[in-house]
Amino acid sequence: GSMDVLCMDKTGTLTNESILLEYYMDVLGNESTRVLDFAFLNSMYHSGVCNPIDNAILACQTMPGRSAYYTRLLAQYQKTDEIPFDYARKFVSTLVTEADGAGQLIIKGDIAHVVARCGFVEYRDAILPMDEDKMRSVASVVDEMLQDGMKVIAVARKRIEKQNRILPEDEQSMILMGYLAFFDAPKKTA
């Protein structure tokens, strides 16, 4: 389920010029606004270069009736730290803190690189250890979306108590939450 090269049509010659967020789902493939919320916080609070994937995620705040919800979500979580995206790691990490000082480390990016840092998986509101069966389930859901021409990224989290800096060592034993799937539709004339 990993991708080494993502080709995007920046000129709009072959595609409709914008990547759209098609699905936000848990590890079983069910729609999950919780996965979208954590991806939104990661996209909003990282300071890296603006990119089409983050733009598609951030556009969720313009969905009908969702603007006030995302305003409240941003008020609930404040950015504390980040480790920017780089092409070796293939994901971005942000640490957000709630009013009580407890934090959530959120990573978002390449499926293989994110899953490699996960020791747990979130299944139906339960946190379970990642094992071979769960890895096969993850691969099955992701492979189906990739075969449909989607770009798929993973979202994972980990609760961090009262810490205001994150280090690469913190990006272990993460909890895989789910996926985001994007589509850049080809033009009918392409």
Which residues fall in each region the model found?
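Conserved cytosolic headpiece of P-type ATPases
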Residues: G1-A190
